[in-house]
Curated annotation (Swiss-Prot):
Phosphoprotein in keyword set: yes
A GO CC annotation given for this chain: site of double-strand break
Gene Ontology BP, a term: scaRNA localization to Cajal body
UniProt cross-references to InterPro entries, sorted A to Z: SWT21/TCAB1_mRNA_Telomere, WD40/YVTN_repeat-like_dom_sf, WD40_repeat_CS, WD40_repeat_dom_sf, WD40_rpt
Organismal lineage: Eukaryota, Metazoa, Chordata, Craniata, Vertebrata
Region (Disordered): 1-53, 92-128, 471-491, 509-538
UniProt KW keywords: Chaperone, Chromosome, DNA damage, DNA repair, Nucleus, Phosphoprotein, Repeat, RNA-binding, Telomere, WD repeat
Name assigned to this protein: Telomerase Cajal body protein 1
Length: 538
């Protein structure tokens, strides 16, 4: 646990008045009448051991014994009196939220010939205390900082399925093919007082294992590490209820159950907390179910998206809320987008235009624009809520499989970043593209690795880009190559041409030199070097 005297070393020498607090090492356990059985975490309740030793801190879900119900706390309640009002069971000293940062002069790097991308100013303006923010700068190739790869290469076919920063930026959540959610803290080297730092491989502080393939996962919308009662993760897996996990201990805190017309348990395909945290919206086949976060169980509101042969058909595969208007958008595997009123779910608009099932949605911070992406579809589409029937413009990317390929917007809404099946990461500057109906080209692309980049996530306050990679490998027919051997009826199958690179990577996107990384860590680890586009960029 970091103290208030420790200072954050910014790789590009940018300065601010506050660094994002790492996850505090504590968690409350409150009382509630509706309870769920949960396992006891490995290694007891010692929070300091969880942060120091990833193995000791890992939590593996096991079926709890009878007679040990877990009381669901009021953590999912969203009304708090003061930020410092924490559970009385938290005995550790809370991390100071005001971390002073050293002020250093920075020099803006020169752009390669032909580059016309504007970066951040050389000296960032003053920032209010408690509201630190660094701007993203994609005028040069992002610098590799750290990553995690050993965790995923221990088992075969354990590729990643996306990554998501916590709303407060204190940690990052990953999903992988071994049906495990992992939580990583920010690299401790960012808090080192030395200028020359060799970043070590990241290790997870928590592991939360689901029973089957994980369909979707998300952070609680009001999550803040300074308020442990808000630190939750929701996940949905095949033939299992929706689980709520404690992001401090990895314990299962609550479950939400949905049943079909035969009273059989059915799994949600998409999850999204409402902006105020009071409701959990879950996508099913032709249906959205709304659960109250203060009342776990099976009670929910059922909102049909398709009735009397009209409406949005197919499985609701993704849900996103507008940051400025009381509405939400739903994407379905039926290749349609639906806009609905938040209060009662009444349909507002139905849009089409994708070639495949919708896999991801994202609203612009201004609330007027939203973006959609689909599987086996080479376009990201931009829509304007002021003209819902009119497609504003499209962005080209490579998506050749059914895998969910994420994209993300930076907090200012200037840059949109997306992964590709070929491993490339594409960056678009959309700040000046409004009103232009033509296709917008990327300002920069780089190659983190040779495998599919399926997950990208931009930090909410630091210029940090997280990427997740990997995909399912299918054997390809090949010849034996041995002379004299009779050819069989069936061709041989081989993975000799596959290059699996399953890893989580962190990239600094703030521009300027990186004094904390004197050597290129990718060359030392044998990873592919990132390259740019244009004259100095690819």
């Amino acid at each position: 646990m970091k103290t208030s005297e420790e200072r954050l070393v910014v790789p590009d020498s940018l300065s601010s008045d506050q660094a994002p607090a790492p996850v505090p090492q504590g968690s409350p356990v409150d009382e509630n009448t509706d309870s769920e059985p949960v396992p006891q975490p490995c290694g007891g309740d010692d929070r300091s051991q969880v942060a120091a030793d990833s193995v000791a801190g890992s939590v593996v879900f096991q079926e709890p014994q009878q007679g040990h119900p877990l009381p669901l706390s009021a953590p999912l309640e969203v009304e708090f009196n003061t930020p410092g009002e924490l559970s009385p069971r938290i005995e550790e000293q809370e991390l100071s939220e005001n971390v002073s940062l050293p002020v250093e002069d920075t020099n803006q790097p020169e752009l390669a010939s032909g580059e016309d991308v504007e970066g951040v100013s050389e000296e960032p303006g003053p920032v209010d205390e408690g509201d630190a923010f660094w701007s993203y700068n994609f005028s040069q190739v992002p610098r590799y900082l750290s990553g995690s790869w050993s965790e995923f290469r221990a088992h075969s076919e354990n590729f990643l399925k996306g990554c998501k920063w916590a709303p407060d930026g204190s940690c990052i959540l990953t999903n992988s093919a071994d049906n495990t959610l992992r939580i990583y803290n920010l690299p401790p080297e960012l808090y080192s007082a030395t200028e020359q730092v060799d970043y070590a491989e990241m290790v997870p502080v928590l592991r939360m294992v689901e029973g089957d393939t994980i369909y979707d996962y998300c952070w609680y919308s009001l999550m803040s590490s300074s308020q442990p009662d808000t630190s939750y993760v929701a996940s949905s897996s095949r033939e299992n209820p929706i689980h709520i996990w404690d992001a401090f201990t990895g314990e299962l805190r609550a479950s939400f159950r949905a049943y079909n017309h035969l009273d059989e348990l059915t799994a949600a395909h998409s999850l999204c907390f409402s902006p105020d945290g009071s409701q959990l919206f879950c996508g099913f086949n032709r249906t959205v179910r709304v659960f109250s976060t203060s009342r776990p169980g099976r009670d929910c509101e059922v909102r049909a998206t398709f009735a009397k042969k009209q409406g949005q058909s197919g499985i609701i595969s993704c849900i996103a809320f507008s940051p400025s208007q009381p509405l939400y958008a739903c994407g379905s595997y039926g290749r349609t987008l639906g806009l609905y009123a938040w209060d009662d779910g009444s349909p507002l608009a139905l849009l089409g235009g994708h070639q495949g099932g919708i896999t991801h949605l994202c609203f612009h911070p201004d609330g007027n624009l939203f973006f959609s992406g689909a599987r086996k579809d080479a376009e990201l589409l931009c829509w304007d809520l002021r003209q819902p029937g009119h497609l504003l413009w499209s962005l080209s990317r490579e998506v050749t499989t059914n895998q969910r390929i994420y994209f993300d917007l930076d907090p200012s809404g200037q840059f949109l970043v997306s992964g590709n099946t070929n491993g490339m990461v594409s960056v678009w500057d959309i700040s000046g593209a409004f009103g232009d109906s033509s296709k917008l080209g990327p300002v920069m692309t780089f190659l983190p690795q040779k495998d599919c980049t399926n997950g990208v996530s931009l930090h909410p306050s630091l210029p940090l880009l997280a990427t997740a990679s990997g995909q399912r490998m299918f054997p390809e027919p090949t010849n034996s190559g041995d002379e004299g051997e009779p050819e069989g009826d069936l061709p041989l199958l081989s993975l000799c041409h596959a290059h699996p690179e399953w890893q989580l990577q962190l990239w600094w996107c703030g521009g300027g030199p990186d004094p904390s990384s004197p050597n290129d860590p990718q060359d030392e680890k044998g990873q592919g070097r990132a390259e740019g586009c244009g004259d100095g960029l690819i």
